[in-house]
């Protein structure tokens, strides 16, 4: 039996699978798909706002996530707005953003917010993974994974178990797991 339970607020089946693969069985993860307004701001501000609102709606413990893809040459853009960039310009467009630059380095950043319930403090857990932007390689079934390369392989080319050991998401969730252990 899991010592802790959280409602992961997501409509993204791939994210849910990754989170469950990393957290369970120590932390039981259930899922609710709630369309939460995303404020404009830093990744931390966006995550905190979504987490507060989700806790109010669920009236219980929630976990929310926001991801950024930060290009060094563009001063951190597209950042927290990567979802909208990808939807609008696709993988080729994400590459084209760096056409005028020799620096293709980027950082994948994942921020999870946990809130025990309405009115409770939001606690943030952030993970980062360095890499670079490359022409799309691998299956096109999870966001920008085909264009983000870490140590010679794009996230899309990696075995899921391997990706879950090194990704920005796994690094953030490791911090969440450590925090939950401290609370026991």
UniProtKB/Swiss-Prot annotation:
Record's GO cellular component terms: cytoplasm; nucleus
Gene3D superfamilies, A to Z: 3.90.950.10
EC identifiers of the protein: 3.6.1.66
Cofactor mode of binding and number, as noted: Binds 1 divalent metal cation per subunit; can use either Mg(2+) or Mn(2+).
Keyword NADP carried by entry: no
Residues bound to ITP: 10-15, 50, 66-67, 83, 142-145, 163, 168-169
Catalytic reactions of this protein: ITP + H2O = IMP + diphosphate + H(+); dITP + H2O = dIMP + diphosphate + H(+); XTP + H2O = XMP + diphosphate + H(+)
Binding residue positions for Mg(2+): 38
GO biological process, one term: nucleotide metabolic process
A GO MF label: ITP diphosphatase activity
Annotated compartments: Cytoplasm; Nucleus
Names of required cofactors: Mg(2+); Mn(2+)
UniProtKB keywords: Cytoplasm, Hydrolase, Magnesium, Manganese, Metal-binding, Nucleotide metabolism, Nucleotide-binding, Nucleus
Family classification: Belongs to the HAM1 NTPase family.
Function: Pyrophosphatase that hydrolyzes non-canonical purine nucleotides such as inosine triphosphate (ITP), deoxyinosine triphosphate (dITP) or xanthosine 5'-triphosphate (XTP) to their respective monophosphate derivatives. The enzyme does not distinguish between the deoxy- and ribose forms. Probably excludes non-canonical purines from RNA and DNA precursor pools, thus preventing their incorporation into RNA and DNA and avoiding chromosomal lesions.
Assembly with partners or alone: Homodimer.
Entry-linked NCBIfam families: RdgB/HAM1 family non-canonical purine NTP pyrophosphatase
PANTHER family: INOSINE TRIPHOSPHATE PYROPHOSPHATASE, INOSINE TRIPHOSPHATE PYROPHOSPHATASE/HAM1 PROTEIN
UniProt name for this protein: Inosine triphosphate pyrophosphatase
Organism annotation: Fusarium vanettenii (strain ATCC MYA-4622 / CBS 123669 / FGSC 9596 / NRRL 45880 / 77-13-4)
Lineage: Eukaryota, Fungi, Dikarya, Ascomycota, Pezizomycotina
């Amino acid at each position: 039996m899991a010592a802790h339970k959280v409602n992961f607020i997501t409509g993204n089946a791939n994210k849910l699978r990754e989170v469950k693969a990393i957290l369970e069985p120590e932390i039981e993860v259930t899922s609710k798909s709630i369309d939460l307004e995303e404020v404009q701001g830093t990744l931390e501000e966006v995550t905190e706002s979504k987490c507060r609102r989700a806790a109010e709606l669920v009236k219980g413990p929630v976990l929310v996530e926001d991801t950024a893809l930060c290009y060094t040459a563009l001063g951190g853009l597209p950042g927290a707005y990567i979802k909208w960039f990808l939807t609008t310009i696709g993988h080729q467009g994400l590459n084209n953003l760096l056409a005028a630059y020799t620096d293709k380095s980027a950082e994948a950043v994942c921020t999870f917010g946990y809130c025990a319930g309405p009115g409770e403090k939001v606690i943030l857990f952030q993970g980062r993974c360095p890499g670079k932007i490359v022409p799309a390689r691998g299956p096109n079934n999870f966001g920008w994974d085909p264009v983000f390369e870490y140590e010679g392989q794009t996230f899309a080319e990696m075995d899921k178990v391997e990706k879950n050991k090194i990704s920005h998401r796994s690094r953030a969730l490791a911090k969440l797991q450590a925090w939950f252990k401290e609370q026991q």
